[in-house]
Design a protein with these regions (language model features):
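Conserved catalytic cores of phosphodiester-cleaving nucleases, focusing on short active-site segments
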Residues: 45, 75-85, 94-106
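Catalytic cores of nucleic-acid endonucleases
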Residues: 89-156
Length: 198
């Protein structure tokens, strides 16, 4: 026979202690937005016929227990076959991109303060490296997905994902942006307005 057991808290105040302080809640929500942003970027790349493999530090157990400095690891490696027809027949070539995904509510702060450091860390190890900056607060008619690359003069350039050479259609970027905003809006509902930042 099945018995249902109800467990009551020892005192009424114990439930109040479950709710984290605003700062901790904001950090948690921003972390969730970052992980959700990674999933959206992975889906966008797969939709553009890329194969995607997670290679970031979180994906490898040895890096979780290793002490000391480690080589920079992007979140994903994305690749797809590019047909190259020449005089000797078609050759199989692959376009490979190292992708780091960053969520920021205020993308302009990331561009000025953090992006150069990220590119300095990654540039030596990953020649075809880009950052996809995910935001729920895009400027003008831009999508929520901005691709950052460093040019020959070491200046960081920002381009909408629909114009970044990944073959992501602008309608797809707009559809994913709308969905992302709805998901992030739901997360924001749980955080008081003064706690939303980053």
């Amino acid at each position: 026979m099945f018995h249902r057991r109800i467990v009551a808290p020892k005192d009424r105040d114990s439930l109040k202690r479950v709710t984290p302080a605003i700062g901790h809640l904001t950090d948690l929500v921003n972390h969730l937005k970052g992980r959700i942003g990674e999933a959206f970027v992975e889906a966008l790349l797969r939709r553009a016929n890329y194969s995607v493999s997670r290679v970031g530090r979180e994906a490898h157990l040895p890096s979780l227990i290793k002490a000391g400095p480690t080589t920079y690891m992007p979140d994903f490696l994305a690749w797809r076959e590019e047909r190259n027809s020449g005089s000797s027949g078609s050759t199989q070539l692959f376009s490979i991109v190292a992708v780091e995904v960053k969520y920021r509510r205020q993308p302009e702060r990331f561009l000025t303060d953090e992006a150069p450091k990220v590119f300095d860390e990654a540039g030596d190890h990953w020649p075809n490296f880009c950052v996809v900056l995910v935001t729920d607060n895009p400027e003008g008619g831009c999508s929520c997905f901005q691709v950052l690359r460093r040019d020959q003069t070491r200046r960081v350039e920002c381009t909408d994902i629909a114009n970044a050479g990944f073959d992501v259609y602008s309608t797809t970027a707009a559809m994913f942006s709308l969905l992302l905003k709805q998901v992030f809006h739901s997360l924001n509902e749980g955080v008081p307005a003064e706690g939303i930042g980053n």
